[in-house]
Amino acid sequence: MFLTLIAAIISFMVSAFTMPYFIKFYQLKKIGGQQMHEDVKQHLAKAGTPTMGGTVFLLVATAVSLLVSLFSIKNTQSLALISGILSIVVIYGIIGFLDDFLKIFKQINEGLTAKQKLALQLVGGLMFYFLHVSPSGISSINVFGYQLPLGIFYLFFVLFWVVGFSNAVNLTDGIDGLASISVVISLVTYGVIAYVQSQFDVLLLIGAMIGALLGFFCFNHKPAKVFMGDVGSLALGAMLAAISIALRQEWTLLIIGIVYVLETSSVMLQVSYFKYTKKKYGEGRRIFRMTPFHHHLELGGLSGKGKKWSEWQVDAFLWGVGSLASLLVLAILYVF
């Protein structure tokens, strides 16, 4: 526990100290910044804001985790666990970095195509499974203490879980501070679970990432001076999925990650309903004002027809939802 606290403090200090230099370098080199949705007019002023800040907090958290773990790793099993989680973080961070690089440096608006990104994510998921999950012998999902055997189909579950939540966190990263603190809330919850399970190596990784993210948030809260980019969001989503697998609490991510599930579901519902109504009525209709869901809240509150919400209001609401969901999981696991 002490080493976890040390890792969190070091990560926070290094991340908070380094980020201004990253922002300044970005601005001095006149690198193109984040592009904004024209439909949300209050976001247009953010055009050109430095992005790819996730590069900094990922490097910091990874380096600190490895450094501090040298004093705590006692066996090869712990080393395999840490390397497994860090490997998926690094792999998905590289995928996100490539996507951001193409958008910003090569001026390719869409970055990687959807098919290219999915292919790389699947390759990363396969590497994670065959190098770290399969050797551990895990082939079942723990649901409320009951082991649901999947056999070889656990491979497909891992791919779905990692790819799905990496993209879900990516969709959540749409307004200042939303994704960073939402992930912190999720990580704190998994930190409690790891502590109860005496999984102190996982707890150390969680502490390092929480510290690095809080250092990043010092510059990502409204008005944001930097965004995490795909390099950060894809890696964070994959990390949450990997941690839920490592702790054998996969099902909890559906509740702990309710914000990411809500954001992703809103997009899927919107697209499906639009296509259905266009085919049936000749014109597409929408359920939400705009998706992902945080934009719907911005444009008209919960109903979509009320007063516009500020980014702080949206943040507070979704952080609150995530916090309550996390408390519910802890209550289910350790109270009821």
Curated annotation (Swiss-Prot):
Q: What class of enzyme is it?
A: transferase
- Just give the chief location class: membrane
Its subcellular locations are: Cell membrane
Q: What single Pfam family name could you report for this chain, choosing any that match?
A: MraY_sig1
Keyword Zinc tagged? no
List, alphabetically, the InterPro entries matched: Glycosyl_transferase_4, PNAcMuramoyl-5peptid_Trfase, PNAcMuramoyl-5peptid_Trfase_CS
Q: A Gene Ontology biological process annotation?
A: cell division
Q: How does it sit in the membrane?
A: Multi-pass membrane protein
Q: Which domain of life is it from?
A: Bacteria
Reactions mediated catalytically: UDP-N-acetyl-alpha-D-muramoyl-L-alanyl-gamma-D-glutamyl-L-lysyl-D-alanyl-D-alanine + di-trans,octa-cis-undecaprenyl phosphate = Mur2Ac(oyl-L-Ala-gamma-D-Glu-L-Lys-D-Ala-D-Ala)-di-trans,octa-cis-undecaprenyl diphosphate + UMP
So what family is this one in?
A: Belongs to the glycosyltransferase 4 family. MraY subfamily.
Q: What is this protein called?
A: Phospho-N-acetylmuramoyl-pentapeptide-transferase
